[in-house]
């Protein structure tokens, strides 16, 4: 099964014409992130059958030279966002590796689906594309992963992500949840939660290759 099959299933159940029209207008009249060509980059870099881990974000970063279609990741020459800095701090404490690039393309190629629940945003306006249809689309994506694959690790940071548990068959997948890595909540239980080693322990116990969370050339 490929993402094209998943998208076909989704679009036969839902009409996204209104969202498509809205986005056409937004990209024509406003500055919107990510670039059009990168909206679906998470799916381009992580083939459906290779998904081992899903990390859920909310909407893309809304500053210049940041969002490129992968949740939590920014372009290589961008400044580190605070949440990503905290993710890397926990990564170092958990598995002992230091990442220097804020770009997570290598994770995506390792089978980590870095999925925002909303895939576009207007510059400088967080949540500006909330409730235009993306949530319906990405809920269906989560359900498709849950239905068609087995032994996937879902990493859910913060309450919005944890509300998606109802979409996941927990009898055949593994949920890792903790507070969000943002500075507002990282010290309330994100630090010390060891999500990276937990994910690999589960994957290996179920006959899958662990994720190389450390920096690698792509």
Swiss-Prot record:
The answer to whether keyword ATP-binding applies is: no
Q: Which GO terms describe its cellular component?
A: cytoplasm
> What EC designation does it have?
3.2.2.27
One GO biological process term is: base-excision repair, AP site formation via deaminated base removal
Q: Which compartment or compartments is the protein found in?
A: Cytoplasm
Q: Where is the active site?
A: 59 (proton acceptor)
Q: Which InterPro entries match?
A: UDG_fam1, Ura-DNA_Glyclase_AS, Uracil-DNA_glycosylase-like, Uracil-DNA_glycosylase-like_sf
Alphabetically ordered keywords of this record? Cytoplasm, DNA damage, DNA repair, Hydrolase
Q: What does this protein do?
A: Excises uracil residues from the DNA which can arise as a result of misincorporation of dUMP residues by DNA polymerase or due to deamination of cytosine.
Belongs to which family? Belongs to the uracil-DNA glycosylase (UDG) superfamily. UNG family.
The entry's protein name is: Uracil-DNA glycosylase
Organism the protein comes from: Staphylococcus saprophyticus subsp. saprophyticus (strain ATCC 15305 / DSM 20229 / NCIMB 8711 / NCTC 7292 / S-41)
> Gene of origin?
ung
């Amino acid at each position: 099964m490929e993402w094209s099959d998943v998208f076909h299933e989704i679009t036969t159940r839902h009409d996204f014409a209104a969202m498509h029209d809205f986005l056409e207008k937004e990209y024509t009249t406003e500055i919107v992130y990510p670039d059009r060509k990168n909206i679906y980059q998470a799916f381009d870099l992580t083939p459906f059958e290779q998904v081992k881990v899903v990390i859920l974000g909310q909407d893309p970063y809304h500053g210049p030279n940041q969002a490129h279609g992968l949740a939590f990741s920014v372009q290589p020459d961008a400044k580190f966002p605070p949440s990503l800095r905290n993710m890397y701090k926990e990564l170092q404490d958990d598995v002992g590796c230091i990442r220097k690039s804020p770009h997570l393309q290598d994770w995506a190629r390792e089978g980590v689906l870095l999925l925002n629940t909303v895939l576009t945003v207007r510059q400088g306006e967080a949540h500006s594309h909330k409730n235009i249809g993306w949530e319906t689309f990405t809920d269906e994506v989560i359900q498709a992963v849950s239905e068609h694959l087995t032994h996937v690790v879902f990493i859910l940071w913060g309450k919005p992500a944890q509300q998606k548990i109802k979409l996941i068959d927990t009898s055949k997948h593994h949920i890792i949840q903790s507070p969000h890595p943002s500075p507002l909540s990282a010290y309330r239980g994100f630090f010390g939660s060891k999500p990276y080693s937990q994910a690999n322990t589960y994957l290996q116990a179920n006959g899958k290759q662990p994720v190389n969370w450390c920096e690698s050339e792509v």
